[in-house]
Amino acid sequence: MKSVMSKIKLFRPVVTLRCSYSSTDQTLLLSEFTRLCYQRDLPRAMKAMDSLQSHGLWADSATYSELIKCCISNRAVHEGNLICRHLYFNGHRPMMFLVNVLINMYVKFNLLNDAHQLFDQMPQRNVISWTTMISAYSKCKIHQKALELLVLMLRDNVRPNVYTYSSVLRSCNGMSDVRMLHCGIIKEGLESDVFVRSALIDVFAKLGEPEDALSVFDEMVTGDAIVWNSIIGGFAQNSRSDVALELFKRMKRAGFIAEQATLTSVLRACTGLALLELGMQAHVHIVKYDQDLILNNALVDMYCKCGSLEDALRVFNQMKERDVITWSTMISGLAQNGYSQEALKLFERMKSSGTKPNYITIVGVLFACSHAGLLEDGWYYFRSMKKLYGIDPVREHYGCMIDLLGKAGKLDDAVKLLNEMECEPDAVTWRTLLGACRVQRNMVLAEYAAKKVIALDPEDAGTYTLLSNIYANSQKWDSVEEIRTRMRDRGIKKEPGCSWIEVNKQIHAFIIGDNSHPQIVEVSKKLNQLIHRLTGIGYVPETNFVLQDLEGEQMEDSLRHHSEKLALAFGLMTLPIEKVIRIRKNLRICGDCHVFCKLASKLEIRSIVIRDPIRYHHFQDGKCSCGDYW
């Protein structure tokens, strides 16, 4: 296919027909062409343009600009090419303003090569010319080209404006580039511009520097909804949900109305902290955007990850439009919350709706099979994903199958599948096998898997802890101590167990061995009372979950202060009986706490939901949604 410039050159040898029109006729012809352009009558305007060209006439730049805008709005690429040829016909040179409009047209048509060729042909370029091209490459994620053009622009002694900087900042992949541009912005006196500050906040957040983003934000005298969204979104994306929510409160106090993008970030923050009450508050703001697909998807995700499946399904069922993200989110949510059969039924509904699954959908389906021990179903979906949906298995799919096989006691098959992976197993894959070894108490294979994980991720404290757990279950205290010594020698610290609970819109954290909570005395008293009552109905501490060689009473005392038990006691103290007690934990719930919560839900007649890094446990009437298969 010929480029636009080669097509233009084909017209240059043509001899222009000398105008046989009178000056009055010329004026009428130009007037008619102008009228048609401003009326956006594209077909008739193109015919009138042919008449102009055949008589060697050209209209003014503003008229052509209107015609080009008409082409852009109608995606009329062919007509746009004809206008470009006309403007360069027989050696004619359009003004810089009009060339910039043409470049913008080709950018809008995603014809960057044609746009750049016109740009290269320009005898002179202004800030609009450069900024249009830089912005185009930045939006198309051709970041290096955008940065190179900025360097050439500066060499050409053209000063960047706020739009140049806001565009090129989003092409920075390293802090050194950002620092350099930030200096240029200050030098040009543009640091107070809202577009520049918004771009700076975005790039700092993208590069994992939210504190720098907050510094830029706090220096602003005034802001707008765009800037607020940038800073809130930045902290939400960097797993700083607490700061994101605090900024959202500041935004509301400042009188700004949250738009879709901001609300999506707020929902992401609530999801990260499992804050159902705050998420519900955000839902109130979303009512006016009830048909916004992205927001509804975020709502479904938030409710699923806060363990409120009724609300998630309500939003899902009320949605008039669903995409693959909607279906995948709901399928994964059901699976993670222990409703595997419902997840697989929803997958069948998804297929019936005509929505094609993607690789994330299949991860959710395999996750459902893994969490319910559906071995035959898991093999079927895994083996058919390529044939039926054209999806090649990736690490996440293999991980689900290894977990499923391991929990089913088929460790040999799990190892065989791991060795047959089409991609290189990573630390997560080996860690999954290690977890299966814990369930099956296979110490030899556990040691092998742990070595693989440590080789790939030597700083991972969780692997050492898991291996130590396996040794402790087998009463191998010398091996437990050896693991601890290795951790000390390498400067690796075990992450302490921490649980969070939301009460009256406030987050309360409980950490094992930490007595800093202002009500810790009352909480401990409540917990001791609960343990005493549970002992009366058959609760016996499972001391094999203690990772220390202690005497019986010491072991029981160690289990007594697990963070989820403290959070549960606090919830029983502070939340009304009709409220579900929702707890988020940073580590996997241990077997003793699992039994404890089942019995507590029956004794206290309460619904308890605990979210750990692996799944959600819904305790009610002495049972758990996981069916003790975890």
UniProtKB/Swiss-Prot annotation:
Keyword check for Transit peptide: yes
Range of the transit peptide: 1-76
UniProt GO BP: RNA modification
GO cellular component term, pick one: mitochondrion
Pfam families: DYW_deaminase, E_motif, PPR, PPR_1, PPR_2
Annotated segments matching region Type DYW motif: 536-630
GO molecular function: RNA binding; zinc ion binding
Keyword terms, alphabetized: Mitochondrion, Repeat, Transit peptide
Stretches for region Type E(+) motif: 505-535
Subcellular location: Mitochondrion
Record has Calcium as a keyword: no
InterPro entries the record matches: DYW_dom, E_motif, Pentatricopeptide_rpt, PPR_At4g14850-like_plant, TPR-like_helical_dom_sf
SUPFAM superfamilies (UniProt xref): TPR-like
PPR repeats (start-end): 60-94, 95-125, 126-160, 161-192, 193-223, 224-258, 259-289, 292-322, 323-357, 358-388, 394-424
Chain spans, region Type E motif: 429-504
The family this protein is said to belong to: Belongs to the PPR family. PCMP-H subfamily.
Protein name: Pentatricopeptide repeat-containing protein At2g03880, mitochondrial
The species this protein was found in: Arabidopsis thaliana (Mouse-ear cress)
Gene (name only): PCMP-H44
